[in-house]
Design a protein with these regions (language model features):
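RNA pseudouridine synthases
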Residues: 1-236
Length: 236
């Protein structure tokens, strides 16, 4: 078997069920499937995660940010601790633009809008977040993509990066995400319809603009031709 990052590129589809979307000298962009933790949780039953699988191939890899277990899509992974510091600084300065696609079970009025609600943790196990006057400031931009009798598809752009931000914001305005088992409990089966589709940032190592898009999950592919015509904020 090949060693180092060549082995990683070859092994990711088999070992992690993920796609290696971008291979850069200082970082990787990986497409995480729904149902997989970004990093280990508490207890041996939560050890399996994206980063533990990747580190089985390359121990020096470091996670720059996280997605919820049930959220699919793009995650930035640093190649080493030195790269991690530079990439983490981009997130801290809010210089990484993220674009999500989601299906919500109730329509939102208008074609676009802003959800500006402070969020706080309301419950610890399982963690639940919701609007609270003492919560952390949170802002989410949304734009309608398509609408049917069953659901409304939205582009979402979080301007802040709080835990459960998109899920809690949409639930708070009466439009929870399809198959969200925390904020929209129901008998609906299948993956949660929330996908981190695109990342955009200025590379801190060579100052070039980086734009990365993922392949959409199966639930989002049917209306993709129309969605392409409604790319949000130049990030689609």
């Amino acid at each position: 078997m090949a060693s180092g990052f060549d082995a990683l590129a070859a092994a990711i589809p088999q070992l992690a069920g993920c796609a290696l979307v971008l291979d850069h000298p200082h970082y990787l962009v990986v497409d995480k499937p729904s149902g997989l933790l970004s990093q280990p949780g508490l207890g041996s039953h939560q050890r399996d995660s994206l980063i533990t699988r990747l580190q089985d191939c390359c121990p020096e890899l470091r996670l720059v940010h996280r997605l919820d277990r049930d959220t699919s899509g793009l995650i930035l992974v640093a190649r080493n601790q030195i790269s991690l510091r530079s990439l983490s600084a981009l997130f801290a300065a809010r210089r990484v633009h993220k674009l999500y696609l989601a299906d919500v079970v109730s329509p939102l009025l208008g074609r676009r809008g802003i959800i500006h609600l402070p969020l706080a943790r309301l419950q610890r196990h399982p963690p639940v977040y919701g609007p609270h006057p003492d919560g952390k400031p949170c802002c989410t931009l949304w734009r309608k993509c398509t609408q049917s009798t069953d659901c409304t598809r939205l582009w979402l752009r979080p301007l802040t990066g709080r835990s459960h931000q998109l899920r809690a914001h949409l639930a708070a305005v009466g439009a929870p995400i399809h198959a969200d088992r925390i904020y929209a409990p129901s008998d609906v089966q299948g993956p949660m319809h929330l996908h981190a589709h695109a990342l955009s940032f200025r590379d801190p190592f060579d100052q070039r603009r980086v734009r990365v898009r993922s392949v959409l999950p199966s639930w989002a592919q049917a209306d993709w031709a129309q969605a392409e015509k409604l790319r949000f904020a130049g990030m689609g």
